[in-house]
Amino acid sequence: MKTLVIVEHDNNSIKGGTYNTITAASKLSGEITLLIAGSAIDSVISEAQSIDGISNILKCDNKIYSNFIAEDLSALIANNIGEFTHILAPSTTFGKNLMPRVSAKLDTQQISDIIAVESDDTFKRPIYAGSLSLIHI
């Protein structure tokens, strides 16, 4: 199993939600690879290199990704999926804008707003406005 984590950042530093996403990814078996797309992202790469448990970092440094347009990023991800079995992104405006597009391009179902990773194929998420939790198997 290989997991791809989409890094949310501001072209200078990694945003906090990404660290939560990496923690969730660490509950899955296999390698964790980070995808960092943006413009002039050397400081983001340096910060990412200090994170424990990361096997690889994919860097895409191009002005087209400087504004984090979901249409551009989703094409990048979908066209370079390789052997990844899981793709994770922070449950932020960034991730909620990006991941449905990636899911559609890959013709697969997205599982949104997970609160726990139980195993490689079981995820816990809240339903009914958070008054009930559901486990997808």
Task: Give short role names for the model-derived ranges.
Residues 1-135:
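N-terminal glycine-rich FAD/FM-binding segment characteristic of electron-transfer flavoproteins
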